[in-house]
């Protein structure tokens, strides 16, 4: 049960981070556009890793709540590291954010 609560806290932290980022973008959109694009790329990579891992480990003997908990944390850290170097999505996402902001301010 403790691991479930810890995972819940991690999810809440990530949600709070995204909500804080939304607030910052509203107040100073140009400053936080790149950070937002990087975070979206990181979330995409994390979802990609999770989907790949789920397709491989469905009937694993070592599959347990604890292993899923640590795997989730590992995937989150790996996705952040991969996103630092980028997979090419940040630039595309940034263009979309800028296009939305330009249309919003017209």
UniProtKB/Swiss-Prot annotation:
Alphabetic keyword roster: Bacterial flagellum biogenesis
Biological processes per GO annotation: bacterial-type flagellum organization
Signal peptide start and end residues: none
Note: This protein is shorter than other FlgJ proteins and lacks the muramidase domain. It may be degenerating and may no longer be functional.
Family named by the database record: Belongs to the FlgJ family.
Protein name: Putative flagellar protein FlgJ homolog
